[in-house]
């Protein structure tokens, strides 16, 4: 296992599916401009600001609200977006707090929202954050390092039953029982402090045949711990409805997910919005029962070979987008 991260002077980060995301949001931004008002778009997972930079560069009248729970990301994106500081509001918050953020800034509705879910390149590449299993680091995994329990807290304090549950549920790991058992046995000797020691315990718990064919043996467990530490799926279940509710008529929501658990949540909510709420077989569809959203993507879209070549981390991305076509249903 490597003990140091990649060099700090690595090539400039290329946002996942940048052009496709911007193109999906473009009609809503342009429609606002044609209506004589400044479009407002929320980048709900700002990260290093690459998607926001692309939008602000392309649309000179756009006002962008960037939200991130990671203060380091806000600092870096703030520097990147400094040329546009008169058209941006960058906010330290979790993206399920979008309603409160908009209220605080005085915006009643927005024309677009972008969510790029999961862990960011910044978090993966910063060794001391503890997100990666490829090199040793403190076992942290918090997206907001100023609050909340760390991954070390989870592996050292959760019962074996609780560990089995989260590793199986959030990591979809079929060897969850073996891994949890080994973790509990190892921590009885010495509490976990670093990612390296956890990786070694997981490696020994996963059968050799499975380790040879299923990718890195720690991948699913690390995903589970990260989701648990940051309450990612709980946040997502609140964030998607809040973001879509904030859309003006013609506004668009673009969401990129990276594993099936995220995509299922997004798919379920979008499917409800694009479907009539009238009872099956009911002879009349009231206006209040008509779909409030329109699908912009054919199911879930995946990256092209060219997009993966531009950013290999795009390989697992799944993209969904909708447009608000009617006011929000109230019942």
Swiss-Prot record:
The UniProt record lists the keyword S-adenosyl-L-methionine? yes
UniProt-annotated location(s): Cytoplasm
Q: InterPro entries, from UniProt?
A: RsmH, SAM-dep_MeTrfase_MraW_recog, SAM-dependent_MTases_sf
Q: Which SUPFAM superfamilies does this UniProt record tie to the protein?
A: Putative methyltransferase TM0872, insert domain, S-adenosyl-L-methionine-dependent methyltransferases
Q: Which Gene3D superfamilies match?
A: Putative methyltransferase TM0872, insert domain, Vaccinia Virus protein VP39
Question: EC number(s) of the enzyme?
Answer: 2.1.1.199
Q: Name one GO biological process term.
A: rRNA base methylation
Main function: Specifically methylates the N4 position of cytidine in position 1402 (C1402) of 16S rRNA.
Against PANTHER family, the record matches this protein to: 12S RRNA N4-METHYLCYTIDINE METHYLTRANSFERASE (PTHR11265:SF0), S-ADENOSYL-METHYLTRANSFERASE MRAW (PTHR11265)
Q: Which family does it belong to?
A: Belongs to the methyltransferase superfamily. RsmH family.
- The name under which this protein is listed is Ribosomal RNA small subunit methyltransferase H
* Gene source species: Renibacterium salmoninarum (strain ATCC 33209 / DSM 20767 / JCM 11484 / NBRC 15589 / NCIMB 2235)
Underlying gene: rsmH
């Amino acid at each position: 296992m490597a003990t140091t991260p990649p060099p700090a002077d690595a090539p400039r980060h290329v946002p996942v599916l940048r052009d496709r995301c911007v193109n999906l949001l473009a009609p809503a931004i342009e429609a606002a401009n044609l209506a004589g008002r400044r479009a407002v778009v929320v980048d709900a997972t700002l990260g290093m600001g690459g998607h926001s930079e692309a939008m602000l560069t392309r649309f000179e009248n756009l006002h962008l609200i960037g939200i991130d729970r990671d203060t380091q990301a806000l600092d870096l994106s703030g520097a990147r977006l400094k040329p546009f500081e008169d058209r941006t509001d960058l906010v330290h918050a979790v993206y399920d707090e979008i309603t409160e953020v908009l209220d605080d800034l005085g915006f009643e509705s927005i024309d677009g929202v972008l969510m790029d879910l999961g862990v960011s390149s910044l978090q993966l590449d910063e060794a001391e954050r503890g997100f990666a299993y490829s090199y040793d680091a403190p076992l942290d995994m918090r997206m907001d390092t100023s609050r909340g329990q760390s991954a070390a807290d989870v592996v050292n304090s959760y019962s074996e039953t609780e560990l089995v549950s989260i590793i199986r549920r959030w990591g979809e790991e079929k060897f969850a029982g073996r891994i949890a058992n080994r973790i509990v046995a190892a921590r009885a000797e010495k509490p976990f402090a670093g990612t390296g020691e956890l990786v070694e315990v997981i490696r020994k718990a996963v059968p050799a045949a499975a380790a040879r064919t299923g990718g890195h043996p720690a991948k699913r467990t690390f995903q589970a711990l990260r989701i648990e530490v940051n309450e990612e799926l709980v946040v997502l279940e609140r964030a998607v409805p809040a973001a879509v509710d904030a859309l003006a008529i013609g506004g668009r929501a673009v969401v990129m997910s990276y594993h099936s658990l995220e995509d299922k949540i997004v798919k379920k909510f979008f499917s409800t919005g694009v479907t009539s709420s009238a009872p099956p077989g009911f002879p009349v569809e009231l206006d209040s029962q008509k779909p409030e959203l329109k699908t912009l993507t054919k199911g879930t879209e995946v990256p092209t070979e060219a997009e993966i070549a531009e950013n290999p981390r795009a390989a697992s991305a799944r993209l969904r987008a909708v447009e608000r076509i009617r006011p929000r249903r109230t019942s």
